[in-house]
Amino acid sequence: ASLARSRKLPAIFLVRTEAARRALVQSGVEHVLVTGEGFTDRLRALSNELATTAVFDGVGGDLLGKIAPSLPMNSTIYAYGFLGGAVPVAIPSVLFMMKNLTMRRFSNFESRTVKDQERLAAALKTLESLIDDPLLATRIGEEFRFDQIEQAMACVLPDGARAVLVAPSHA
């Protein structure tokens, strides 16, 4: 959100709870949708209005299958995470054909920016100017041990708080 705002790029953010939506809106984020009943109709209208054609998906699972029919023509989905756990991504083949969708894996470690020292330096300088943005602060909610990763992944906390994994203390 911080990067999109700093570059004046239209962006739509999907969240799981109304509390998370309120937290983002209070931070100045304009287009935030809760992934509840009927959100795909609003997503379709808003994505067409804003001409958004890139999806950065850190969740995977069934959410991607829900939003795919609402995406504009020629959209590209960049998958970079798996907060949806082991739930498979299911998108009907006909959607790829009808909407000319593309799905790609995204990794910061393999991007053109990271492989080019000048681009990397410029990107880091940009991020440096945003690092103190409150939107980038992790609001720590419940703590889990490493062996509780499945519970942490399934944990939904209010107000945008996050489940975090903590290393065992070696006292």
Predicted regions and their residues:
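Short amphipathic alpha-helix with an adjacent loop that forms part of the alpha/beta core around
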Residues: 38-50
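Short conserved AdoMet
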Residues: 48, 71-72, 157-158
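N-terminal Rossmann-like NAD(P) cofactor-binding module of classical short-chain dehydrogenase/reductase
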Residues: 53-56, 78
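Local beta-strand N-terminus motif with an aromatic residue
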Residues: 29, 51-52, 136, 149
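Short acidic-hydrophobic, aromatic-tinged amphipathic segments that line or gate anion-handling sites
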Residues: 31-38, 141-147
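Glycine-rich phosphate-binding loop and adjacent beta-alpha segment
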Residues: 24, 62-133, 167-171
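Mid-domain Rossmann-like dinucleotide-binding core that forms the NAD(H)/NADP(H) cofactor-binding site
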Residues: 1-36
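C-terminal capping/lid region of NAD(P)-dependent oxidoreductase domains
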Residues: 128, 134-142, 150-171
